[in-house]
Amino acid sequence: MISGKILRDAIISGANNINNQRSRVDELNVFPVPDGDTGTNMGMTVGASVAELNALDDSCTVGESAKTAASAMLRGARGNSGVITSLLFRGFSKALEGKKEADVADIVAALQKGVEGAYKAVMKPTEGTILTVARVASEEAAACGAEEIPALWDVVLTAGQKALEDTPNPVSYTHLTLPTKA
């Protein structure tokens, strides 16, 4: 199970990691527009949630942590990658709304809801982007059968890394089925 405190601390840690790796992420930004600002925009977006998350009490629920992060990211979103990141978190938070803690099934559902919401919100979703990385990680999470959160995160990280390595080659995504807009 993940508590609100654990989720809060994980998001803060992730924000710090993105900001520490900002230049490296900027260099990865080659498709569809090689403008070299993905790390900067994601760092600013996720970083916008840190102060509000730090203000949460250690007894916060997982739903409160997710909602706080998503709301702050939406307000602080910068650039396409930042907006998409905030949309992923918005869907993630909706799936955790009202939950005190989250188990593997809750996290898988939250990842799926985040991807679904982001694809629906983007007018022309392009494969080989942050959307693809999130979708592939979510699909692998749903299929892996993990029983514990650490095992689930290992699958998510491995799948995300593999999808990221494939992003410069959009042809590798031609066989994939895109989520449909409702």
Question: Which residue stretches match the model-derived regions?
Answer:
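N-terminal cofactor/phosphate-binding cores enriched in small/glycine residues
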Residues: N20-V25, N29-F31, T38-L53, A66
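Glycine/serine-rich anion-binding loops at beta->alpha junctions
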Residues: V33-T40, M73-I84, L176
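Single conserved hydrophobic/aromatic residue that forms the stacking wall/gate
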Residues: H175-A182
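A structural-propensity feature for long, helix-poor, extended segments
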Residues: E101-A142
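Flexible, glycine/charged-enriched surface loops at secondary-structure junctions
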Residues: R24-V33, D58-V62, A121-I130, A146-W153, ...
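N-terminal amphipathic/basic leader segments beginning at the initiator methionine
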Residues: M1-N29
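Transmembrane helical cores of multi-pass ion-transport proteins
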Residues: G4, Q21, A51-M73, E101, ...
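Hydrophobic or amphipathic alpha-helical targeting/insertion segments
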Residues: F89-S93, E97
